């Protein structure tokens, strides 16, 4: 009997909990309807209000469904454990549970409330979706209007009226309409989303190509290239590799003969053993440069894979790229004039400063070695003598044409620091 009483108590508690939750749903719906008709209702924030109400309603709906599930499970156990009472007694648990008018009324009430609230939520969501669609269309037209204006610069246009006056008037209008808190909240959410999305996209753009090329290289490319090379018996030596290999072989041969002379073992060595030793040196040298040739081909293929991966990311996530560009511009323009001038001066000195030719020479030599070539001094000298000059001209044109229009104070600070 204790088990029967415990199960019956669970049935009553579950049904009571579901019934109380349904009454809360009914009350919340009525309160929201009264709030919409009151003077405190703000049409600009009804979306946030409905989102909160929708969240609370879903929470109570989940409580009802979970309580009804416990109710049904407990009823099944009760019916399973009392077959004799079900068939012979009108006072049995079966009769009390399934033929009780109060229980039937509560279940009908709960079902009606659930159906009504789901219909109401569906209508509100459809209306909410239509409003969002209209807002997106308005925003799209607004952005198209901005993009069509070629003379627009960064975030603020340059007109006859100074920008400080327009900003002051806009803030004054915002204060009068009482929307300062709402605008600040939206700006904060937008800035937070912009920063997080930009940082995520930046890490994704840097790490994903590196991970893809590394996995492709380690898992399949190295093994396939070695098998193909050994099977085809290719001896791929370009002109630069031949020069390097020949020079290294001459150095190794000189060291070998010097070692024989200093140790006074030349008389004890036969001509055949000396030739065999030199042959082994040549074979080891060929194996070394064969591996370098394989490594060069692997690096070329992985470079193409990395470039292809970056291109795919840029094509797929164009919106994220736009957000990243906007965030970087906003970050740069939010700095003080001194910091802006400092970063511009730092970048220009690194790329086109007095000591920059040495850095360009090192960079060009690394590129030559990466592709398996001997650094060509003529090409390196030509690049170092022309590219920084072209880059310096482009930077000066950018400062004169673009930066001088946006913020003349940055240009003045830059020239003062440069002098």
From Swiss-Prot:
Its main location: plastid. One of its GO terms (molecular function) is antiporter activity. Contributes to K(+)/H(+) antiport activity by supporting proton efflux to control proton extrusion and homeostasis in chloroplasts in a light-dependent manner to modulate photosynthesis. Prevents excessive induction of non-photochemical quenching (NPQ) under continuous-light conditions. Indirectly promotes efficient inorganic carbon uptake into chloroplasts. It comes from the Eukaryota. It comes from Chara vulgaris (Common stonewort). It is found in: Plastid, Chloroplast inner membrane. It is a multi-pass membrane protein. GO terms for biological process: potassium ion transport. It catalyses: K(+)(in) + H(+)(out) = K(+)(out) + H(+)(in). Keywords: Antiport, Chloroplast, Hydrogen ion transport, Ion transport, Membrane, Plastid, Plastid inner membrane, Potassium, Potassium transport, Transmembrane, Transmembrane helix, Transport. The gene is cemA. The chain crosses the membrane at residues 196-216, 297-317, 344-364, 371-391. Coiled coil: none annotated. GO terms for cellular component: chloroplast inner membrane. PANTHER family: CHLOROPLAST ENVELOPE MEMBRANE PROTEIN, CHLOROPLAST ENVELOPE MEMBRANE PROTEIN-RELATED. Belongs to the CemA family. This is Potassium/proton antiporter CemA.
């Amino acid at each position: 009997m204790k088990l029967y009483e415990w199960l019956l108590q669970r049935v009553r508690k579950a049904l009571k909990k579901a019934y109380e939750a349904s009454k809360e749903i009914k009350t919340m719906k009525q309160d929201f309807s009264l709030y919409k008709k009151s003077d405190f209702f703000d049409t600009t924030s009804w979306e946030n209000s409905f989102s909160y109400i929708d969240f609370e309603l879903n929470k109570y709906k989940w409580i009802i469904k979970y309580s009804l599930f416990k109710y049904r499970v407990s009823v099944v156990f009760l019916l399973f454990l009392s077959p004799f009472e079900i068939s012979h007694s009108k006072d049995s648990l079966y009769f009390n549970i399934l033929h009780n008018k109060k229980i039937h009324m509560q279940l009908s009430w709960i079902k009606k409330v659930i159906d009504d609230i789901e219909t109401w939520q569906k209508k509100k969501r459809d209306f909410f979706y239509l409003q969002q669609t209209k807002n997106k269309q308005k925003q799209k037209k607004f952005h198209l209007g901005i993009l069509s204006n070629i003379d627009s610069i960064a975030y603020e246009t340059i007109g006859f009226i100074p920008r400080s006056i327009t900003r002051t008037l806009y803030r004054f209008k915002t204060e009068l309409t009482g929307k300062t808190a709402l605008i600040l909240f939206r700006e904060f959410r937008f800035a937070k989303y912009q920063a997080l999305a930009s940082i995520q996209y930046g890490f994704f753009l840097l790490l994903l190509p590196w991970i893809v090329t590394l996995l492709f290289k380690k898992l399949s490319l190295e093994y396939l290239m070695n098998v193909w090379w050994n099977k085809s018996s290719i001896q791929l030596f370009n002109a630069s590799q031949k020069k390097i290999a020949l020079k290294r072989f001459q150095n190794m041969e000189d060291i070998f003969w010097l070692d024989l002379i200093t140790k006074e073992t030349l008389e004890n060595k036969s001509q055949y053993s000396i030739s065999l030793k030199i042959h082994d040196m040549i074979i080891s040298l060929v194996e070394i440069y064969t591996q370098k040739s394989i490594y060069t081909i692997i690096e070329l293929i992985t470079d193409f894979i990395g470039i292809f991966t970056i291109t795919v990311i840029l094509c797929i996530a164009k919106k994220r790229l736009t957000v990243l560009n906007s965030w970087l511009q906003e970050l740069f323009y939010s700095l003080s004039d001194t910091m802006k001038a400092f970063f511009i001066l730092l970048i220009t000195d690194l790329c086109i400063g007095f000591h920059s030719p040495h850095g360009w020479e090192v960079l060009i030599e690394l590129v030559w070695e990466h592709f398996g070539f001997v650094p060509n001094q003529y090409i390196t000298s030509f690049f170092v003598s022309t590219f920084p000059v072209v880059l310096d001209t482009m930077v000066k044109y950018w400062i004169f044409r673009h930066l001088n229009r946006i913020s003349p104070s940055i240009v003045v600070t830059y020239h003062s620091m440069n002098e």
